[in-house]
Amino acid sequence: MIVKGTYFQNSEEKPLVYGDVEIHNIPRRRLRGEEEKEGIIAESVFVGFCGTDYTLMNMGREGNLKQKFPEGCNRLINGHEGVVWVPDENRFAIVLIRGGNSYDPTRYTEEETYFEYGCDQADGLFSDKNYYNPDMLLKIPDGYVKDGKIPLSICKKLVFSDPYACMIFQRERMEDIGEAQNFRVKMAQYKCSEAEAREIARKETFDRVCIFGLGTTGMFIGDLIHQRYPDAKIVFVARSEESSPKVSFALKQSGASYVRSAFDTNEELADAIREKLGGTATVFIGSSGAAIEHEIAFRYGVLGCNGIYNSFSLGPEIAFDTMPFGFKNQVIFGSINFRQDHMEEAIRILLDSCYDEIVELIDKDEFTEDPVNAYENKIYAKGAPMKTAVIWNEQYII
């Protein structure tokens, strides 16, 4: 089937183009042990832009996308965030992005395979239509759709289903690791049972949280920690002015404090973070993509003894002195994924959120006329909105 869409290709001059593209119904499985299923057609309604798209575009410019293409193709239709319409089932849906031959997408092993719609070996949402495994088209709860149309405000909220699900998993991982890391010392401290100590350790994991970076992922994890642990002391660190709308919105959502990264030295920045936290961090979450994250946490001592370093950035290398690291009993982990239950929970939470307020639209014609220019000079340019999205098919939106 030939459809209109944008797709990545290996080309220095045109790594992302819009035009006719052939889509293929490749059988796919959701999880290991399940049968492969042919896809059913879903029409793209509302699609968001993600930093992964920008990274993939640059990979195409450098000729490094071959391993990302679907089998038998020399291009990848991008897009993995948004709302689709499923004609055969007369409903809207959110696409569960990751599937394949793994028992648990958050714990895949080297011998297991996976795919991601719009990112890795499977075409995504930036086309008029596409094929999706029917088990991976998640339902939107009743009460938000009327007469086959969906409100724009709901679409804006649900465009975050993927990254918000990622952050729900991040919170789960920090809970699991923090509990396992510190329950024995809590047994000794509180003279209590193992079950009681595990609960205490899980909660105290979030006593003092430093979130380095204030994109949507940093904002979401702060929000989610605050929802479950309202007494947690949360400090965001970023370069924006504290009076900026982005910072104000994030602080309101999470009840957090803020340190602007505008000091002359890293020592001064680290001192300011510790002062805001009221001590060293029990959890340090790196989400800025900058190498300074690990330096502030380890070299300049913001991460405390028995603390957790959550590396959510892609790109920076982490370095640390093994002597203090070992004696401080710290843990470093990285896990960028989520399960279906995480995304279903994200959908429920987002529907009652105010995250539609931070989504701005780009006109579809403006985007498709020159996708590369739109990416570089509007969507990911300095001063761009926190989130940009496009109405792909306006007939379904009210």
Task: Describe each region flagged by the PLM.
Residues 163, 213-216:
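Glycine-rich Rossmann-fold phosphate-binding loop(s) that bind the pyrophosphate
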Residues 178-212, 226-229, 244-331, 397:
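Glycine-rich cofactor phosphate-binding loops and adjacent beta1-alpha1 units
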